[in-house]
Swiss-Prot record:
Primary role: Binds 16S rRNA, required for the assembly of 30S particles and may also be responsible for determining the conformation of the 16S rRNA at the A site.
Subunit structure as annotated in this protein's UniProt entry: Part of the 30S ribosomal subunit. Contacts proteins S3 and S10.
Name of protein: Small ribosomal subunit protein uS14A
Annotated gene: rpsN
A GO molecular-function descriptor: structural constituent of ribosome
Species, as recorded: Myxococcus xanthus (strain DK1622)
Presence of keyword rRNA-binding: yes
NCBIfam families: PRK08881.1
SUPFAM superfamilies referenced in this protein's UniProt entry, alphabetically: Glucocorticoid receptor-like (DNA-binding domain) (SSF57716)
Sequence similarity: Belongs to the universal ribosomal protein uS14 family.
PANTHER family linked: 30S RIBOSOMAL PROTEIN S14, SMALL RIBOSOMAL SUBUNIT PROTEIN US14M
Species lineage: Bacteria, Pseudomonadati, Myxococcota, Myxococcia, Myxococcales
Source organism, top-level taxon: Bacteria
PROSITE patterns cross-referenced by the UniProt entry: RIBOSOMAL_S14
Presence of the UniProt keyword Protein biosynthesis in the record: no
Record key words, sorted: Ribonucleoprotein, Ribosomal protein, RNA-binding, rRNA-binding
Length: 101
């Protein structure tokens, strides 16, 4: 199990990303808009830099829904490789069967 504080911090980051998503997208569009003057684009860059650091989606870590493990995650299932294997062997994941050839 991951530390509860790490899982909670990641959840807080997800909330911040959702809260600032529209504002961040609008600022990035202004930065890329070549019709604006340099000063306006620079002001948009400064505004983007002044947003909370944790509102950047790159800072959100994919974690296992069961254990909070940050590494070895399968995106499709939202589980770590270990939790996925345990659930699959118990038959708790529909459509997943152990391979044999």
């Amino acid at each position: 199990m991951a530390k509860k504080s790490k899982v909670a911090r990641n959840a807080q980051r997800k909330a911040l990303v959702a809260k600032y998503a529209k504002r961040r997208a609008a600022l990035k569009a202004r930065i890329r808009d070549r019709t604006l003057s340099y000063e306006e684009r620079r002001a948009a860059q400064d505004a983007l830099a002044s947003l909370p650091r944790d509102s950047n989606p790159n800072r959100v870590t994919n974690r296992c829904a069961l254990t909070g493990r940050p590494r070895g995650n399968l995106r499709r299932f939202g589980l770590s490789r270990i939790a996925f294997r345990e659930k699959a062997l118990r038959g708790e994941i529909p459509g997943v069967i152990k391979s044999s050839w």
